[in-house]
UniProtKB/Swiss-Prot annotation:
This is Nuclear distribution protein nudE-like 1. Residues 335-346 have a biased composition (Pro residues). Residues 188-200 have a biased composition (Polar residues). Keywords: Coiled coil, Cytoplasm, Cytoskeleton, Microtubule, Phosphoprotein, Transport. The gene is ndel1. Belongs to the nudE family. It comes from the Eukaryota. One of its GO terms (molecular function) is microtubule binding. It is found in: Cytoplasm, Cytoskeleton; Cytoplasm, Cytoskeleton, Microtubule organizing center, Centrosome; Cytoplasm, Cytoskeleton, Spindle. One of its GO terms (cellular component) is cytoplasm.
């Protein structure tokens, strides 16, 4: 309206009318603008109140979110610490399990090697048994020639006495070792329930050898043997002071078996000679009565000699079977070891 051109008036009345109408229009526009301003102010006040309310709510929500954020940060930190702790524990447990697995594999390999050695030892024992059977058969064939060697048997009788001295000493030491082994087994009974039980075969073998020596009749010690066998100081079952190798254990058992077989052979020879002497004395009709009575004593000695010979001919393998040791492949399958035994030193 400011740029509106003022028209040219022909008369003052037209000019008055024009300006009156212009004043009315301006007044009307002013009134409308004022109403709009009032309405706008009311709307702005309402909007401002609403915005204030929304601002308060937003600030409250923001404070809540900040507190939640802080709480969640604390929880995240605690969870991170727990996760790190759990990860450390898991890593440690995995390391322990890997170490146990490595030890178990090592023990498994050692047990496989030990089983192979036992199988080889069983094969050696079987061959020794067959060789012993062959030698016994050969000895039966040459038994008739042994009658002419009575003088030599007297010297072998002295050797028998020295061997019996060694056997008696072995029996005493075996009894002491068995008592010590029983004490140590009772002491270690609590720690013997988690490991495999197959390596107890050495203990069974040693026990069978000791039982074989204990099955002989006790003979009083009359002489001292210069070249007697000196047994080991500890049983090689993992509880002694110095565990022996499998070859040393097998050699010790072979020595004990040879001693037992040698004693049995000597006793059988002595019994055969006494039986022959008794038969020769009974065939002579002019033999005095005193000799007959002494022949009765000789028969008693022969009967005792036969008993000794039977005990001597009970081989190491038979005694092992009686005492609970049954070599695989010779007398059948080996019975399972007790589940509470610890593995022996390999």
């Amino acid at each position: 309206m400011e740029n509106e051109e003022i028209p040219e008036f022909l008369s003052p009345k037209e000019e008055i009318v024009y300006w009156r109408e212009l004043a009315k229009r301006l007044k009307q526009s002013y009134q409308e603008a004022r109403d709009e301003l009032i309405e706008f102010q009311e709307g702005s006040r309402e909007l401002e109140a609403e915005l204030e309310t929304q601002l308060v709510q937003a600030e409250q929500r923001n404070r809540d979110l900040l507190s939640d954020n802080q709480r969640l940060k604390c929880e995240v930190e605690s969870l991170k610490e727990k996760l790190e702790h759990q990860y450390a524990q898991s890593y440690k447990q995995v390391s322990l399990l890997e170490d146990e697995l490595a030890r178990a594999r090592s023990i498994k390999d050692q047990l496989h090697k030990y089983v192979r050695e036992l199988e080889q030892a069983n094969d050696d024992l079987e061959r020794a048994k067959r060789a012993t059977i062959v030698s016994l058969e050969d000895f039966e064939q040459r038994l008739n020639q042994a009658i002419e060697r009575n003088a030599f048997l007297e010297s072998e009788l002295d050797e028998k006495e020295s061997l019996l001295v060694s056997v008696q000493r072995l029996k005493d030491e075996a009894r002491d070792l068995r008592q010590e082994l029983a004490v140590r087994e009772r002491q270690t009974n609590g720690t013997r329930k988690s490991a495999p039980s197959s390596p107890t075969l050495d203990c069974d073998k040693t026990d069978s050898a000791v039982q074989a020596s204990l099955s002989l009749p006790a003979t009083p010690v009359g002489k001292v043997c210069d070249n007697s066998f000196t047994p080991p100081k500890g049983i090689p079952n993992g509880f002694g002071t110095t565990p022996l190798t499998p070859s040393a254990r097998i050699s010790a058992l072979n020595i004990v078996g040879d001693l037992l077989r040698k004693v049995g052979a000597l006793e059988s020879k002595l019994a055969a000679c006494r039986n022959f002497a008794k038969d020769q004395a009974s065939r002579k009709s002019y033999t005095p009565v005193g000799l007959n009575s002494s022949g009765g004593g000789s028969s008693a000695l022969n009967s005792s000699g036969v008993k000794y010979s039977h005990a001597g001919h009970t081989s190491f393998f038979d005694k092992g079977a009686v005492n609970g040791y049954d070599p695989p492949g010779v007398l059948g399958s080996r019975p399972p070891s007790p589940p509470g035994m610890l593995p022996l030193s390999v």
